[in-house]
């Protein structure tokens, strides 16, 4: 549940004219160079090969031993890294963003960090402090690219809470939150006050060491939020695993309370809702109503969800009831219901309610654009769209050329850090990668058209 006061965007004219269904037929590929299309086709086909995704880290290690680090790195930069990553330096990121904005797309920068540190060194406060520095730099970079190439009011970036606090602590807090007597001790107001004052909460459910880590985590979150607000950058908080999401929602709600100001506009922090969970529509409706009753703005990033396999394996391991939708069709119905709920709230409550339709599904995009027109929601208003860099360009480009606000999620960083991150994200998004067959077909069609010299 995330709330802040006042609108993010000014009032603008609603969508005019008759609604025309967008054509996701690859027609907008004329904006891309042939080399970019060829790389996209090659990489997407590789990523749709299950063994490569499953054993990606092993393949990377094998290629380094066989080819050497330099040649292996060059091949990765020319393929997977170049397709999905903006670059390593600030200049490379700026160049990538400039290319995107030239074709009607906006950046949503992301620091590639792992939510489950896999070594003792990465569980220390020093590792989280290093992530804090990276997040603060991401805020600065998000503002810099907006100032250079686009409207600063639309600056957004992704924030992964478990880059700044331990997943184990979040799991402990989540378990406590779900107990009847735990809810009174763990109130967002208490955490928000601790963020501001710096005083240790001394929660009874945590050990001394855990309380100290919680206080340090609150301080880190507060610093990122304050800096983002000062730079006019909005924070979109990533969803994570169900067993830690209650704690993440608590932390985000506390964070939003610290950002509430009558002198600034809009939802500074947006939470992510995963449609593949059975209770998402109910939670979304409850949170939206609570925000409205409190007179606060409400920001939502709506996704289908990327942790299905892990969620089900954890459920089976602990003998718990499956919290996920039974199949993709049920998830799509859930997404459609949540989308309709949020679009109606945007229509009824104007700039106090904001939504990112984060989806690669063409039918969901069509539903959103049709309902925006029917409800009179302006194209440059409180509803925007989001897709991953290097994927779903036939949808992103069509939306951007039609005048919608479209963001590409853009990781950046050095090869050694980003490749393991990309492989793990690919493992989480197997269904998306394997479902990109239509995009591959459109890319192939466009490449053949160019090779044969045919007109579009």
Curated annotation (Swiss-Prot):
Domain of life: Eukaryota
Signal recorded as keyword: no
Post-translational modification N6-acetyllysine, affected residues: 310, 320
GO terms under cellular component: mitochondrion
A Pfam entry, by short name: Pro_dh
Enzyme Commission number: 1.5.5.3, 1.5.5.2
Keywords: Acetylation, FAD, Flavoprotein, Oxidoreductase, Proline metabolism
Catalytic reaction equation(s): trans-4-hydroxy-L-proline + a quinone = (3R,5S)-1-pyrroline-3-hydroxy-5-carboxylate + a quinol + H(+); L-proline + a quinone = (S)-1-pyrroline-5-carboxylate + a quinol + H(+)
InterPro entries: FAD-linked_oxidoreductase-like (IPR029041), Proline_DH_dom (IPR002872), Proline_oxidase (IPR015659)
Single GO MF annotation: FAD binding
Cofactors: FAD
EC primary class: oxidoreductase
GO BP annotations, alphabetical order: proline catabolic process to glutamate
Family: Belongs to the proline oxidase family.
Known function: Dehydrogenase that converts trans-4-L-hydroxyproline to delta-1-pyrroline-3-hydroxy-5-carboxylate (Hyp) using ubiquinone-10 as the terminal electron acceptor. Can also use proline as a substrate but with a very much lower efficiency. Does not react with other diastereomers of Hyp: trans-4-D-hydroxyproline and cis-4-L-hydroxyproline. Ubiquininone analogs such as menadione, duroquinone and ubiquinone-1 react more efficiently than oxygen as the terminal electron acceptor during catalysis.
Protein name in the entry: Hydroxyproline dehydrogenase
């Amino acid at each position: 549940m995330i709330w802040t006061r006042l609108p993010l965007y000014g009032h603008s004219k609603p969508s005019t004219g008759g609604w025309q269904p967008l054509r996701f037929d690859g027609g907008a590929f004329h904006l891309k160079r042939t080399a970019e299309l060829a790389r996209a086709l090659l990489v997407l086909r590789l990523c749709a090969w299950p063994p490569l995704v499953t054993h990606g880290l092993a393949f990377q290690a094998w290629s380094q031993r066989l080819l050497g680090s330099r040649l292996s790195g060059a091949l990765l930069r020319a393929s997977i890294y170049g397709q999905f990553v903006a670059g390593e330096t600030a200049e490379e990121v700026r160049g990538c963003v400039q290319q995107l904005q030239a074709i009607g797309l906006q950046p949503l920068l992301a620091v590639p960090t792992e939510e489950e540190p896999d070594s003792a060194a990465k569980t220390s406060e020093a590792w989280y402090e290093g992530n804090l520095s990276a997040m603060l730099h991401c805020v600065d970079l998000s503002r810099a690219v907006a100032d250079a190439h686009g409207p600063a009011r639309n600056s957004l970036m992704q924030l992964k809470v478990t880059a700044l606090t331990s997943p184990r602590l979040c799991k402990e807090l989540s378990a406590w939150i779900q107990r009847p007597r735990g809810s009174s001790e763990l109130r967002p107001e208490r955490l928000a006050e601790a963020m501001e004052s710096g005083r240790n909460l001394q929660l009874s459910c945590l050990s001394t060491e855990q309380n100290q880590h919680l206080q340090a985590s609150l301080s880190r979150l507060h610093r990122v939020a304050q800096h983002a607000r000062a730079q006019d950058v909005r924070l979109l908080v990533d969803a994570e695993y169900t067993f830690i999401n209650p704690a993440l929602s608590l932390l985000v709600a506390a964070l939003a309370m610290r950002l509430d100001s009558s002198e600034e506009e809009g939802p500074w922090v947006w939470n992510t809702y995963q449609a593949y969970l059975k209770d998402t529509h109910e939670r979304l409706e409850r949170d939206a109503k609570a925000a409205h009753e409190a007179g606060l703005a409400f920001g939502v990033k709506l996704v289908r969800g990327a942790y299905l396999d892990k969620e089900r394996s954890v459920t089976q391991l602990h003998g718990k009831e499956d919290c996920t939708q039974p199949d993709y069709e049920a998830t799509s119905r859930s997404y459609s219901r949540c989308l309709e709920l949020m679009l109606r709230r945007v229509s009824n409550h104007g700039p106090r309610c904001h939504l990112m339709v984060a989806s690669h599904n063409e039918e969901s995009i069509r539903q959103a654009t049709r309902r925006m027109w029917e409800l009179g929601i302006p194209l440059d208003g409180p509803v925007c769209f989001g897709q991953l860099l290097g994927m779903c360009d036939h949808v992103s480009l069509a939306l951007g050329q039609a005048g919608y606000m479209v963001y590409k999620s853009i990781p950046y960083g050095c090869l050694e850090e980003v490749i393991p991150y990309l492989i793990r994200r690919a493992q989480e998004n197997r269904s998306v990668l394997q479902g990109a067959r239509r995009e591959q077909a459109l890319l192939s069609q466009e490449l053949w058209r160019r090779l044969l010299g045919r007109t579009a």
